[in-house]
């Protein structure tokens, strides 16, 4: 009985060790996720909405929560951004992400908290908080869920 218990305990320990990420993998994942966000920020500041959207999972399963509304799908999210920031009478402004806290949930998932700040041509400065869920796909890290809330 003791032998069986020892074997089972060893197998559990081996499986747990195999599933845990190395510190390097965790740091590499965090850097890759931050790179996606910086690439999005740069694309936004070039008024490149398609480049900004490249950071999102191009799937009907993408979810976006903001302003008390729930949006589903990459195309619907793009349409929302276009209507609010890239249509006549609406400007994209300059975007800055700050206070990023990236937590790896595994080797292929991450949770991000942060702040956004927009500086608009008319001098207004919308800002707020966001939480993001990232997943790692064959083509890289993508946002699969975005919850953004603007400050009042």
Question: Where would I find each of the regions flagged by the language model?
Answer:
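Bacterial N-terminal signal peptides that target proteins for export
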Residues: 1-8
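Short, low-complexity N-terminal intrinsically disordered segments enriched in polar/charged residues
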Residues: 13-55
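A mature extracytoplasmic/lumenal domain signature
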Residues: 57, 68, 101, 114-116, ...
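Surface-exposed, charged secondary-structure patches
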Residues: 76-122
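Hydrophobic pocket/interface hotspot
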Residues: 40, 52-53, 61-62, 73, ...
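A short gly/proline-enriched turn/hairpin at secondary-structure junctions
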Residues: 55, 61-72, 86-90
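Short beta-strand edge/turn micro-motifs at domain boundaries
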Residues: 127-152
């Amino acid at each position: 009985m003791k032998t069986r218990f020892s074997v089972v305990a060893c197998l559990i320990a081996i499986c747990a060790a195999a599933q845990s990420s190395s510190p390097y993998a965790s740091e590499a994942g965090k850097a890759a996720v931050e790179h996606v966000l910086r690439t999005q920020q740069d694309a936004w500041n070039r008024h490149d909405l398609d480049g900004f959207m490249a950071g999102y999972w191009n799937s009907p399963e993408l979810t976006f929560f903001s302003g008390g509304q729930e949006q589903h799908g990459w195309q619907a999210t793009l349409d929302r951004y276009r209507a609010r920031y890239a249509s006549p009478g609406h400007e994209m402004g300059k975007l800055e992400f700050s206070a990023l806290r990236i937590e790896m949930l595994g080797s292929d998932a991450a949770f991000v908290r942060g702040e956004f700040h927009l500086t608009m041509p008319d001098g207004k400065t919308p800002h707020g908080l966001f939480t993001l869920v990232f997943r790692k796909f064959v083509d890289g890290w993508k946002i699969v869920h975005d919850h953004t809330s603007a400050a009042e």
